[in-house]
Amino acid sequence: MRILQIVKTNRGATWAFNQAKWLMENNVEVVTVLPEDRGGYADKYMAAGMQVVKGDWSLPLRRPWKFFGRAKEIRRVVAEIKPNLIHLHFVTNVLMVRLALHSDKTPRLFQVPGPLHLESPFFNFGERIVATDSDHWAGACKKTCRIYEEKGIDPARVSLAYYGGPLAQQAQEPAPAGPILRPEYGIGQEEKMIAMVSYFYKPKRYIGQTRGLKGHEDFIDAMELVFKKHPQARAIIIGNAWDGAEAYEKSVIAYGKEKLGDRVIFTGYRNDVKDIYPEIDIAVHPSHSENLGGAAESLAYGVPTIATNIGGFPDIVVDGQTGLLTPVKDPEALAQRICYMLEHPDETREMTDRGQALVRQLLEIANTAGTIKGIYEKILKEG
């Protein structure tokens, strides 16, 4: 079985790499199209024995004159690789490939990493209108699958397929020698670390967004309220700007310092997040749109987790059972839930233990990638 995978970024999408690596190790040949064939994840794919093809297969909305040349290149590569199935992860790639291969009968699978584009009427309609009988969908959360079915897509062409990671291997890794952020930033042992781990995604003004997608400003507003009841808490924001959002990141830092003063710490990018998680008291995910997001990571590391009640979060953050859900864009409600966890440590620990067990089983790469392999086989068998 030969799969042609299309990934729009060479910088991230670790979930796509983990999945492809497992598939390669389990008798599925994976050829991956990336914007670059050197550096970044291209090197990781090749080190894992996978062929990488250089190509930007995104829909050139801002440079429409590039469309026909790009479509010609897509048809050339597909004719050369001769895949049994084309696997896509990003809507901009999906639109481009469907238009370029509209009459091509090669089966295509869109593994939808989140419901964000479905929340835009333009992309929601556009993505479905260019689909043909060759197209199939694998939603990476229950909400995504539900939206497609509600929009009239045949349920037989829609599957549930989470992205996963090597969680069993992670569980065997030695614990860090000791705290990292506490000594680095002079955080006392009595201070509770309430953390948000996320890149900064700038607001999309053209669709009316005034705050960033990940809800950084909501977290800051919530922590201002938390400090009134729990002055011993500290707000920690880990991450940096994503894809040209440097000006937005600076504005959030300024906003945070204005509202919280020295009680908020912005660490910037860290390559040791997995070693930092054990010292975090509560992980907060106030996203405005999301799949499973960072909640999967914080639960996997056994950190008490609060997330907004949107997207795929409820699949793993079962309110009151594995963590707490909070209304989206509601800093006051978020503050109440942070305070609840601080004031109920035993109950919080029990929820977190259940959440860790759920995530480590549900999102183990052998289970998630095994599901994708089964979907491939089903699509190809049905012809």
Where are the predicted features?
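Short His-centered aromatic/hydrophobic patch
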Residues: 88-94, 112
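A conserved, positively charged/aromatic
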Residues: 109-138, 151
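Nucleotide-activated donor-binding/catalytic signature segment of Leloir-type glycosyltransferases, i.e.
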Residues: 239, 249-268
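Acidic donor-binding loop of glycosyltransferase active sites
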Residues: 278-291, 303
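Conserved acidic donor-binding segment of nucleotide-sugar-dependent glycosyltransferases
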Residues: 319-320, 324-331, 340-346
